[in-house]
Amino acid sequence: MNIEYISSLFEFAGGIGMFLYGMNTMADGMQRSAGGKMKKLLGYLTSNRLLAIIVGAVITAIIQSSGATTVMVVGFVNAGLMTLVQAVGVIMGANIGTTITAWIVSLGQLGDAAKVMNPSFYAPFLIGIGAFVILFSKKDKVKNAGEIIVGIGLLFEGLTFMSSSIAPYTDAPIFSQAFQIVGSNPFLGILIGIIVTAVLQSSSASVGILQTLALNGVVTTNAAIYITLGQNIGSCVTALISSAGTTRTAKRAACMHILFNIAGALLFGTVGFILFSIYPALAAHNITSVEISVFHTFSVSYTHLRANET
């Protein structure tokens, strides 16, 4: 292994680190800015499931973690402050809200012609401004805003690092061979998505990494579909762990989270497998970052909104 490969590996690892740290920093700043309002909002929910879905989506979009939202829900159910019906609605909304990060990442799809519209163009500036705000402001609210700004900047700078480290090797046979294997085996693709998301404790982060690979034109459509479905299931691990030692109703709330996502994986995985068998050219097509965002949003939203009608 020559020095170029080692350098690219270090750059990719650094990119993942910046992306994850940026996302967590942004989420922490948003949570502190909102204070206890989000928990109060959850506590005041009525039995209106549609309202619960909207609230779950909004809260998850703010804190960038469906797992964290579901953990809060499990805690409320365990304390008797929320019914299972209310919890199910919030969990549905939490899964929909987690797709926001995918759309933010997909903005990196903008090419040089629209460089000034690409958030990555402003990433270093945002990091600098946010750092000055954090260091020199004496007000907590302003410092929280600085954390949000730094987090956004680090998130996009991390994506840039990951993308640039992969770019020189996109023509390497190992990429095409790996995604061909994953694309031809739905269970393998779903399993990879589950494992990566469970390890990172964030479906937003794992989807973001997949989108970065897609930006470099190395991800086939069938592989991306199966991996994304697995990522949705993997996002349930945190809530399942948090439900240990809680009441039966709280455990049911956590189980509903994973059941929704398994149902979605079975539905879209089956439909995808049939379509890819009929149209092999579609399966081999290199998917874009935006297309991953579209599928991620549609699959999650359709599954949960259909469940809400039943």
Regions found by a protein language model. Name each.
Residues 46-72, 186-209:
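Hydrophobic alpha-helical transmembrane segments of multi-pass integral membrane proteins
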Residues 72-94, 102-121, 197-234, 243-249, ...:
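Membrane-interfacial helix-loop connectors
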Residues 62-69, 88-104, 120-125, 155, ...:
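Membrane-embedded alpha-helical segments of transport systems
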Residues 2-10, 111-121, 179-181, 294:
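Interfacial loop-to-helix junctions that mark the boundaries of transmembrane helices
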Residues 3-45, 49, 149-191, 195, ...:
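Helix-loop-helix hairpins and the membrane-proximal interhelical loops
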Residues 16, 27-31, 60-68, 166-167, ...:
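Short helix-coil transition sites and intra-membrane helix breaks within transmembrane domains
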Residues 303-310:
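Conserved small/polar residues in nucleotide/adenosyl-binding loops
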Residues 36, 44, 56, 60, ...:
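Alpha-helical transmembrane segments of multi-pass membrane proteins, especially transporters
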